[in-house]
């Protein structure tokens, strides 16, 4: 199939209700999405993916297995380069009308430099090893790795703050969801400023898996996971191949995922966020905190 025949019309729509979000149809070509799925299945071992949330397996972009995928797949290297480009960040900031000056960093995704070999050895030592079965040496490696990350986050975050910027990193994963996968109504964790999803394949509305955007009932206090009875469904976005959805993570950026019910349905997607390394997203005004689980990326 030629590149021209794979090309999809590209359009970006932005919305302010129920919270700031955008829908970018044709962000990726159909053929490119197919190749990304094929390469991910070919070059990454299923055992290297983390099973979470009952029906979703994810491969973080900070893992050794993801590094191997990048080394093996030109398509994934191209996507990685595009997502980490100044143009992609500027598109998110400008379209969502964010008033933030970001300073991109690579605390968790650094694959070069003096600390990179040490970090990779720690990750490889821990790969596919449950903590309860880990040796004292592996536990020590995990502790060292997390200390290095915290120190770098604080250092780079402080430097950026002195310059009037916010230190951030693009943290994402390749995910595959199957029958039974569902997400309750929630907002994302405190360190995430902009959340995005890229769908690699389409799923029929009758098979579930739609992204649902919700509005909080007037007068109800915002909390990270509100009671469904306190929310109104504003929009339902059925996954379409090549579509990017992104939104600002505010105190009322409530969304959920409809349960996947199709027995043979698998949804392939990227989930990620522009993640601030120090401090809390200033748009989160609710009284209840929802800490970001940094352990996913170590």
Question: Which residues make up each language-model segment?
Answer:
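Fe(II)/2-oxoglutarate oxygenase catalytic core
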Residues: 1-298
């Amino acid at each position: 199939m030629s590149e021209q025949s794979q090309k999809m019309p590209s359009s970006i729509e932005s919305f302010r209700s129920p919270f700031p979000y955008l829908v970018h149809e044709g962000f990726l070509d159909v053929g490119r999405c197919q190749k990304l799925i094929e390469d991910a299945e070919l070059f990454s071992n299923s055992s290297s993916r983390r099973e979470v949330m009952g029906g979703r397996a994810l491969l973080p972009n900070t893992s050794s297995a993801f590094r191997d995928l990048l080394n093996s797949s030109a398509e994934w290297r191209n996507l990685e380069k595009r997502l980490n480009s100044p143009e992609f960040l500027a598109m998110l900031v400008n379209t969502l009308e964010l008033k933030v000056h970001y300073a991109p960093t690579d605390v968790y995704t650094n694959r070069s430099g003096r600390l990179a070999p040490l970090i990779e050895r720690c990750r490889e030592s821990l790969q596919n090893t449950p903590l309860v079965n880990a040796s004292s040496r592996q536990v020590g490696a995990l502790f060292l790795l997390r200390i290095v990350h915290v120190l770098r986050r604080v250092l780079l975050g402080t430097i950026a703050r002195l310059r009037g910027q916010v230190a951030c990193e693009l943290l994402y994963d390749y995910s595959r969801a199957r029958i039974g996968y569902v997400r309750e109504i929630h907002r994302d964790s405190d360190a995430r400023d902009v959340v995005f999803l890229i769908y690699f394949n389409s799923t029929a509305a009758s098979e579930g898996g739609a992204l649902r955007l919700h509005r909080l009932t007037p007068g109800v206090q915002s909390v990270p996971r509100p009671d469904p009875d306190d929310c109104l469904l504003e929009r339902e976005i059925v996954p379409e191949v090549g579509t990017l959805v992104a939104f600002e993570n505010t105190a009322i950026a409530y969304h959920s995922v409809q349960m996947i019910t199709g027995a043979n349905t698998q949804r392939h997607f990227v989930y990620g966020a522009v993640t601030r390394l120090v401090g809390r997203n200033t748009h989160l005004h609710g009284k209840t905190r929802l800490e970001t689980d940094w352990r996913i990326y170590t």
